[in-house]
């Protein structure tokens, strides 16, 4: 295959990935989708990002047994985008983002928890920046663009949507270390069927 043909294939793949992303983004935000679908959209986002920045972001995803579960639509891309903008982009030489999903039992034994972790090996945050994020997440009011950057407001939106659907004990938890990276954990009940948004596990019924 010639260089020109290779470029044609690359452009075609970019157009397809962009088209699928646009189609996904313009749908109703309140939809529940499979976790695997969310991961696929994240892969396409990072693919398009790497086309622009010469492949400086390595994305890894692991969701053994959890891909079939349902999650609120558009909860992962804002977190992954945040990881790139604030973690990987300021770091020389690029970096990696790991998205993992696992089902864990709660101590009370009543519900199972889906925990999705987004980790990057970027520049990390100092305590002041981390405190600002924690303050934003803990607040009852939506983030104000003049006070917070728009990526953080995207994280706040995801956090609030999860809590609205499932309860205040769920949502986002953030930890970070300067020079090591940032970890964002999304916690929600296991949802095994579309439309099940009450935090109850129907397994075995």
Regions found by a protein language model. Name each.
Residues 1-175, 183:
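Two-component histidine phosphotransfer core
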Residues 182-190:
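Short C-terminal beta-strand
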Residues 196-205:
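Intrinsically disordered, low-complexity acidic/proline-/asparagine-rich linker or regulatory tail/stalk regions
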Residues 191-195:
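Short, charged/polar, Gly/Pro-enriched secondary-structure boundary elements
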């Amino acid at each position: 295959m010639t260089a020109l043909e290779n470029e044609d294939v690359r452009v075609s793949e970019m157009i397809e990935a962009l088209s699928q992303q646009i189609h996904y983004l313009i749908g109703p935000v309140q939809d529940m989708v499979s976790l695997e679908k969310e991961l696929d959209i994240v892969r396409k986002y990072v693919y398009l990002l790497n086309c622009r920045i010469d492949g400086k972001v390595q994305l890894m995803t692991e969701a053994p047994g959890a891909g079939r579960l349902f999650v609120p639509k558009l909860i992962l891309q804002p977190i992954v985008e945040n990881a790139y903008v604030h973690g990987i982009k300021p770091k020389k030489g690029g970096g990696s983002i790991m998205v993992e999903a696992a089902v864990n039992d709660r101590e009370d034994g009543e519900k199972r928890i889906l925990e999705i972790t987004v980790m990057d090996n970027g520049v990390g945050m100092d305590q002041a920046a981390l405190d600002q994020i924690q303050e934003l997440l803990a607040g009852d009011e939506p983030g104000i663009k003049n006070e917070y950057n728009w990526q953080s407001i995207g994280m706040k939106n995801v956090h609030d949507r999860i809590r609205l659907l499932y309860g205040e004990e769920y949502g986002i938890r953030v930890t970070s270390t300067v020079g090591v990276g940032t970890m964002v954990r999304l916690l929600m009940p296991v949802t095994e069927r579309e439309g099940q948004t009450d935090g109850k596990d129907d397994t075995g019924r």
